[in-house]
């Protein structure tokens, strides 16, 4: 019998996109939710209870070992690039974690970010080296332990597995973690265990679960005992309408006990809301709480559980809110909830884009990811996109910030009508259900807008250029002088004034020709014929002379302050030469 005072340990599964987190959980629970999620990536936290009986059944070697924990509750954190507060909350919520790494691809940026989260949260974890069945030449032994299956492989495959495992060991060492393959680890507190597995064939899954149970049992007994008693504490995963029940909450209870009739407090769109639990619906073991299924009604639940709560007045509860059972300490809990919700607020800038999302976790996910890409956010809110949101966004001065990102949240009809109007161009709206795709769309649009703006700026700003008069290419001496020149650097355009390298004015370059065709501009390296008004060859200029475009001071300021990084090296050098000539006479010219 499981000790009723010991709660189910919470396990979170983290890792790089497409490394097989959801597939691994699918294998463990025997269901398949991969295809139902947007972009085949899990966007909201789901929870699955895997009872100890199921784990014993999978791992024959555990049948005789006394186990006093009731099973494992898995949280499947979002599987895309945004390792965010939703994940950090997943990390903090979890007692243990499985970090999924594709054995062939090794560590990716998100893997390292997941490691940092687990380190920050001080969460013990195991590495699941997935997709061993993809190793060339691997012979499948369905549902066997890794060591049993490994023993049946040929030497080349064994060597390949060893090499790939030690590449992971090496990378972990670089990041400050001591690790080895699980069967070579004697002290699981000091060393990370790497368990090679295949979600597709089930190989190694039993070993992984055995290690997780062992870790929980050996190192977390006291912590798990203490958490099962007292008033319940949890996190609201989702606020949902259920037929026959009205508005319900999907909750992860991570501490204490929750019973029918308990008064509970949560954050709502207005402030803190309290209500009494009408009914508790517990998912049947081995089912994912986010998949529609029958629930069993229970009178009370003990942490850790994924539970559905039915109660009056839940309509405005915010997904991601903490949930507390009150015991006459309402003021204290309300203050705690308000503090926690304030901490959720993201870093907002004076100027930036506007974002809307369906849950706090999603909002944070979006904000954190935008922050990592140095995209500023001016306003971040939970809820649908309204006409008012668009009107507010219109006031943003920078056109590349006059943008609204809508993640997984509806656009209300009045706003949709505005967006559909082909004449409405004031605000650019991006909406989607996969965070990284949404951000990629915005970044692509923003970069294109910048490119268009830069092109327009280049066309309006006079560009630096340096030319040299070529021998045997004087076609006319004056009125206007027509000569052949080579462009030594920069970008030469027609209709500009020219000066010598000592700053002396020469005349006005009126037109240019290349192979007897009129052109507007010429890049470095080209040889062209130019007409110069106000100059006479043999008097003001001679063959072999170098000339520079005489740039107005206001154009130099724009070039140096706004466009310098977009100028090629030769253009930058010509600009520097011209500015140095002008500053000999006027030290602060162009500054």
Curated annotation (Swiss-Prot):
Q: Which UniProt keywords apply?
A: GTP-binding, Initiation factor, Nucleotide-binding, Protein biosynthesis
Q: Which GO terms describe its molecular function?
A: GTP binding; GTPase activity; translation initiation factor activity
Region annotated G1 sits at: 15-22
Pfam families, A to Z: GTP_EFTU, GTP_EFTU_D4, IF-2
Q: Quick one: where's region G4?
A: 130-133
Answer whether the UniProt record assigns the keyword S-adenosyl-L-methionine to this protein.
no
Q: State the Gene3D superfamilies in the record.
A: P-loop containing nucleotide triphosphate hydrolases, Translation factors, Translation initiation factor IF- 2, domain 3
Q: What are the annotated GO cellular component locations?
A: cytoplasm
Q: Where is this region: G3?
A: 76-79
PROSITE patterns in alphabetical order: G_TR_2
- Residues annotated to bind GTP: 15-22, 76-80, 130-133
Cite the residue spans of the region called G2.
40-44
Instruction: Note down the stretches annotated as region G5.
Output: 198-200
The tr-type G domain covers: 6-220
The UniProt record lists the keyword Transferase: no
Checking HAMAP family in the record gives: IF_2_A
Function text: Function in general translation initiation by promoting the binding of the formylmethionine-tRNA to ribosomes. Seems to function along with eIF-2.
Q: Which family does it belong to?
A: Belongs to the TRAFAC class translation factor GTPase superfamily. Classic translation factor GTPase family. IF-2 subfamily.
Return the protein name: Probable translation initiation factor IF-2
């Amino acid at each position: 019998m499981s000790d009723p005072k010991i709660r189910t340990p919470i396990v979170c599964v983290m890792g790089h996109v497409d490394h097989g987190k959801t597939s691994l959980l699918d294998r463990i629970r025997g269901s398949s939710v991969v295809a139902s999620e947007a972009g085949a990536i899990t966007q909201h936290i789901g929870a699955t209870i895997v009872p100890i009986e199921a784990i014993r059944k999978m791992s024959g070697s555990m049948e005789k070992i006394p186990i006093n924990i009731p099973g494992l509750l898995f949280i499947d954190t979002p599987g895309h690039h945004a390792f965010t507060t939703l994940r950090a909350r997943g990390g903090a919520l979890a007692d243990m974690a499985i970090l999924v790494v594709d054995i062939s691809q090794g560590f990716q940026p998100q893997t390292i970010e997941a490691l940092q989260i687990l380190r920050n949260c001080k969460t013990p974890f195991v590495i699941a080296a997935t997709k061993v069945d993809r190793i060339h030449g691997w012979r499948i032994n369905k549902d066997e332990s890794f060591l049993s299956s490994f023993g049946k492989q040929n030497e080349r495959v064994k060597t390949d597995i060893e090499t790939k495992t030690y590449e992971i060991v090496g990378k972990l060492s670089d990041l400050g973690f001591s690790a080895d393959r699980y069967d070579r680890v004697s002290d699981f507190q000091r060393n990370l265990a790497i368990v090679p597995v295949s979600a597709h064939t089930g190989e190694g899954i039993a070993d992984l679960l055995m290690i997780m149970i062992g870790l929980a049992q050996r190192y977390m007994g006291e912590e798990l005992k203490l958490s099962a008693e007292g008033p319940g504490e949890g996190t609201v995963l989702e606020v949902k309408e259920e037929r026959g029940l009205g508005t319900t909450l999907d909750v992860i209870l991570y501490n204490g006990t929750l019973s029918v009739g308990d008064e509970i407090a949560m954050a709502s769109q207005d402030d803190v809301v309290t209500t009494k639990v009408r009914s508790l619906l517990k998912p049947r073991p081995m089912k994912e709480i986010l998949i529609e299924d029958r629930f069993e009604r229970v009178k009370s639940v003990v942490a850790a559980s994924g539970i559905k709560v039915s109660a009056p007045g839940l309509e405005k509860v915010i997904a991601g809110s903490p949930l507390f059972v009150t015991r006459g300490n309402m003021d204290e809990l309300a203050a705690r909830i308000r503090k926690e919700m304030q901490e959720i607020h993201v870093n907002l800038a004076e100027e930036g884009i506007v974002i809307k999302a369906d849950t706090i976790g999603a909002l944070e996910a979006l904000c954190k990811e935008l922050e990592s890409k140095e995209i500023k956010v001016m306003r971040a809110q939970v809820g649908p996109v309204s006409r008012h949101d668009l009107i507010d966004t219109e006031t943003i001065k920078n056109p590349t910030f006059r943008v609204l990102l809508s993640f997984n949240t509806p656009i209300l009809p009045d706003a949709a009508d505005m967006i559909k109007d082909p004449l409405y161009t004031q605000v650019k709206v991006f909406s989607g259900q996969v965070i990284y795709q949404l951000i990629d769309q915005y970044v692509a649009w923003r970069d294109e807008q910048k490119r268009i703006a830069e092109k327009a700026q280049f066309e309006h700003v006079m560009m630096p250029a340096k030319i040299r008069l070529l021998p045997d290419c004087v076609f006319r001496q004056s009125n206007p002088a027509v000569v052949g020149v080579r462009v030594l650097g920069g970008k030469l355009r027609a209709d500009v004034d020219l000066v010598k390298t000592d700053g002396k004015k020469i005349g006005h370059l009126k037109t240019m020709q290349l192979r007897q065709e009129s052109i507007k501009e010429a890049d470095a390296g080209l040889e062209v014929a130019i007409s110069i008004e106000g100059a006479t060859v043999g008097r003001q200029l001679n063959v072999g002379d170098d000339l520079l475009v005489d740039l107005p001071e206001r154009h130099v300021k724009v070039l140096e302050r706004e466009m310098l990084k977009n100028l090629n090296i030769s253009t930058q050098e010509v600009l520097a030469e011209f500015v140095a000539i002008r500053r000999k006479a006027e030290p602060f010219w162009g500054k």
